[in-house]
From Swiss-Prot:
Pfam families linked to this entry: PGK
Assembly notes: Monomer.
Name under which the protein is recorded: Phosphoglycerate kinase
GO CC term, one of those recorded: cytosol
Cellular localization per UniProt: Cytoplasm
Annotated keywords: ATP-binding, Cytoplasm, Glycolysis, Kinase, Nucleotide-binding, Transferase
Record organism: Rhizobium johnstonii (strain DSM 114642 / LMG 32736 / 3841) (Rhizobium leguminosarum bv. viciae)
Family: Belongs to the phosphoglycerate kinase family.
Catalytic activity from the UniProt record: (2R)-3-phosphoglycerate + ATP = (2R)-3-phospho-glyceroyl phosphate + ADP
EC code: 2.7.2.3
Pathway note: Carbohydrate degradation; glycolysis; pyruvate from D-glyceraldehyde 3-phosphate: step 2/5
Gene this protein is translated from: pgk
Length: 401
């Protein structure tokens, strides 16, 4: 297990200035936050520190500002939603460094919560500039990183600060790292991975890493067509990266060498147009008509996938099995998700899932809360699945050494 310090290692923090890196990169429409999930995830850390009397100073980025500050990317837009979720007053500052930040921090009382302005309004944030990092650190006594979703970036507020202040993992970061350790770090075996989505090209590193770590790899979604075509099967008009046939073959060779079973669809649900309620039928995967496209894996394939889930002690899931956004091509994803959720509830399976489409698919199936852990981290979750070291995590481990 990676070793890092958590809030449990913090004692007597009353009056201490705690810089907390959080992920507040939430969707906003017409000036209003439309989804507060990320705020809800960091609420326990913020409130725990506040209740212990710390001066809680929140650091976050929002969007991708191109040329310094812009009002439409100001965290002042997010502050009311943070207040609402926390049920606690949230102070704001017009900058994250300099006099504006320093005077706002100086005016804080014990237990106060202050949201500093968007760190990306300064180029030094993404450059991990040492002067900018020192300017951030000047307002804190302790650093807590609760933004696993930004841990794959070596930025000033995600990595740099841990070199200047005592560094700890927040509750969300801790939960994410402990769940990921159970998923791939030191999992109960057998381990089955489900990888879906449209393209092999975006997941080559992930697939190459997984075949060395899991006992079976289920491939679904559009990317399955690339593997099926690489075997010499006609996939009709299905989404397929024919130019990656050799890559697909190489992944299958690596899997065979590592003793990892590759599970590809045996049947598919085909249609001639990509729209909700399109006329469709189920065919054997070797009998796809030239004018049709596969939009979901078929019932025989779902049975095979569920049999692997039945055998598994650990399941890692990234990407839907079909075009789940439009019915009826959500059937396989929903069926497998519900089966995995049932095994998890019964205490037979540790299930870890992540990636934007995956979270949407599990919500669509109504089982996101029934998985052991569902990561909302996106890019950081994928890089972890690829076996890459995450700078924001590595620096916490180093700080605890």
């Amino acid at each position: 297990m990676p070793s890092f310090k958590t809030l449990d290692d913090l004692s007597d923090i009353r009056g201490k200035r705690v810089l907390v890196r959080v992920d507040l990169n939430v969707p906003v429409k017409d000036g209003k936050v439309t989804d507060v999930t990320r705020i809800e995830r960091v609420a326990p850390t913020i409130l725990e520190l506040s209740e212990k009397g710390a001066k809680v100073i929140l650091l976050a980025h929002f969007g991708r500002p191109k040329d310094g500050p812009s009002s439409d990317l100001s965290l002042s837009l997010i502050a009311p939603s943070v207040e609402e979720v926390l049920d606690h007053a949230v102070l704001t500052a017009s900058d994250c460094i300099g006099e504006a930040a320093a005077s706002a921090v100086a005016a804080m009382n014990d237990g106060d919560i202050l949201l500093l302005e968007n760190t990306r309004f300064h180029k030094g944030e993404e450059n991990n500039d040492s002067d900018f990092t020192k300017a951030l650190a000047a307002n804190g006594d302790i650093y807590v990183n609760d933004a696993f979703s930004a841990a794959h970036r070596a930025h000033a507020s995600t990595e740099g600060l841990a070199h200047h202040l005592p560094a700890y993992a927040g509750r969300t970061m801790q939960a994410e790292l402990e769940a990921l350790e159970k998923g791939l770090g030191d999992p109960a075996r057998p381990v089955v991975a489900i990888v879906g989505g449209a393209k092999v090209s975006t997941k080559i590193d992930l697939l190459m890493n997984l075949v060395k770590k899991v006992d079976a790899l289920v491939i679904g979604g559009g990317m399955a067509n690339t593997f099926i075509a690489a075997r010499g099967t006609n996939v009709g008009k299905s989404l397929c990266e024919h130019d990656l046939a050799e890559t697909a073959k190489q992944i299958m060779i690596e899997a065979a060498t590592a003793g990892c079973a590759i599970i590809l669809p045996e049947d598919g649900v085909i249609a001639r147009e990509f729209k909700a309620g399109a006329a469709n039928e189920t065919v054997d995967i070797n009998a796809i008509p030239a004018d049709a496209m596969v939009l979901d894996v078929g019932p025989k394939s779902v049975e095979a996938i569920n049999a692997w889930i039945e055998r598994a002690a650990t399941l890692v899931w990234n990407g839907p099995l079909g075009a789940f956004e439009i019915g009826p091509f959500d059937a396989a994803t929903v069926a497998a998700a519900k089966y995995a959720a049932g095994r998890t509830i019964a205490g037979k399976l540790t299930s870890v899932a992540g990636g934007g489409d995956t979270v949407s698919a599990l919500n669509h199936a109504g089982v996101a809360d029934d998985f052991t852990y569902v990561s909302t981290a996106g890019g950081a979750f994928l890089e972890w699945m690829e076996g890459k070291e995450l700078p924001g995590v590595a620096v916490l481990n180093a700080a605890a050494a």
